[in-house]
C-alpha cells in the first residue's frame, strides 16, 4: 500500500511544475480519476477486515483527496490568472468595449450521480465491468432465468433489432445484468463488480424514459449469504445520501435471476413516505448453472438501481424528463463543476 505522504509529496512536486491547464488536467486524472493513484488506494478499503482500520484508512484517503483537490484548484486559478495577464499584456485593450461574460460548462446531474455512485462502490472493492448495448436474447433473458413466455420478452416491452447472433434475436439490452453474464463467462470466481451503463425499454412517461441508466452489482464467492447483501445495501445507501439516519426496509419480491428476492424502500425521516429505490436478492442457482459455476461451492448476491432515480432523490428533481431535454438553464441550475470530485469516503464512518 503506497504511503499517503509519499503520494501527496509526489502530487505537489508534479503540480508545481505545471505550466498550462492541459497538463494540469492530465495530472488531475492521474491522481483523482477513476483509475488514478488515489482512487486505486481507495479501492483497497474493501480488503480491510478490521472496521477501525477501514475507518482510519478511509479518513486518511479522504483527507489526501481534499488536499490534492485544493492544490489542483489553486494551481488552475494561478494558471488562468497568468494566461489572462499575458493576454492583456500582448493585446491592445479598448476600454470602451463591453466585457464578455465568462461561460463555463457544467457536469450533467446524471454524470455527477453516476460518478458518486461508482465512488461509493469502489470503497467496497468493487471493480467496473462494461458490455455492449446491443445484446442477443441469451445474455439478456435466457441466461438470467427468464422463461420463454415472460412478459419482458414481448415486443411492447423490448426494442428488438433486425438480425441474429448465433441464431439468437438481437435487441437493445433492457438491463445491465447482461454484463454480469459476460463477465462471469469470461472469468472465474470469486467476482465483485458493478456494471454501470445505458439500458433501453419501450416506455415513456413522467417516471419512465425509453433510455435510462442503471448500475447493477454482483458478488460471487464462497459462503455468501443475505447478511452480506443487507450490509452492502444499507452501508451504500447511507453513504451515498450522507445520512446515517436513513431507514431501510427489505420487502419480499420476485425477480427471475434471484431467489430470494427483495425490493428496498427508504425514508429520510420517520414521518416520510417509503420510497422504492432498488431491487436485490441472492443469485438464482439456475443463473450459476447457465454459466457453468458450481452451485454447491459458490453463492452470491446481485442488486440493481436506476441512476436517474437516485439523482432525483438526492438533487430534489421532480420530473425525469428534464434530464433529457437539454435545457442549458436547467443544467446550469445544478452547476456541477469539472473539479467537483465526488468525495464520500466520510459517509462510511458516520
UniProtKB/Swiss-Prot annotation:
It comes from Rickettsia prowazekii (strain Madrid E). SUPFAM superfamilies: Class II aaRS and biotin synthetases (SSF55681), tRNA-binding arm (SSF46589). It is found in: Cytoplasm. It is an enzyme of class 6 (ligase). GO terms for molecular function: ATP binding; magnesium ion binding; phenylalanine-tRNA ligase activity; tRNA binding. Binds 2 magnesium ions per tetramer. It catalyses: tRNA(Phe) + L-phenylalanine + ATP = L-phenylalanyl-tRNA(Phe) + AMP + diphosphate + H(+). This is Phenylalanine--tRNA ligase alpha subunit. Its EC number is 6.1.1.20. The keyword Nucleotide-binding applies. GO terms for cellular component: cytoplasm. Keywords: Aminoacyl-tRNA synthetase, ATP-binding, Cytoplasm, Ligase, Magnesium, Metal-binding, Nucleotide-binding, Protein biosynthesis. Belongs to the class-II aminoacyl-tRNA synthetase family. Phe-tRNA synthetase alpha subunit type 1 subfamily. Its cofactor is Mg(2+). Tetramer of two alpha and two beta subunits. Mg(2+) binds at residue 259. Its main location: cytoplasm.
